[in-house]
Amino acid sequence: MQLKNKNTIGFVGAPWTLLVYMINQQSPKKNVEKNFFEDDYLINRILLIIEKFLKIHIKNQIENGANVIQIFDSWAGLLEEKDYPNYIYTPTLNLVNYVKSLNVPVICFPREIKNYKEFCEIVKPDAVNIDYNVDPSMICKNIKIPVQGGLDPKVLITDKENLKKQVLKYLDIFR
């Protein structure tokens, strides 16, 4: 159902995050089944299959009114940096390129990734979502695309003054 005069965001999990859930059959908490990393060929084949189905899902969302797509890689932080090219950068770049080929902007959220700058330079999203463990001043200095997020959700349940203080801090940094 398309909403007239309303912008909507389509959401997909990144191939790596979906694979993590498939391996663990639940939220991995802070680790992933170590034995799985022994077969790099298998991992890459599964990531390609996931990517293929995500493209179908993305296209369906766009055809049904999504004006932007956000790719969540909730478990990017589980990997070591040496594994980013195969498991994070390449599959996500393929999806970003696909979304852009449909003339739709794309936001990426590589949660807890250790190098947001490198991610943005390689994957080239239109915007990036950051998690609250990231120093916003470092992001502001190093990333030249729109940034969203970064505020610890726990701030939302504190008093109004603390919430206002944290929001103003972010506004000052990103102005």
Q: What is the role of each PLM region?
A:
Residues 12, 65-85:
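Glycine-rich, proline-tolerant flexible connector loops at the mouths of alpha/beta enzymes
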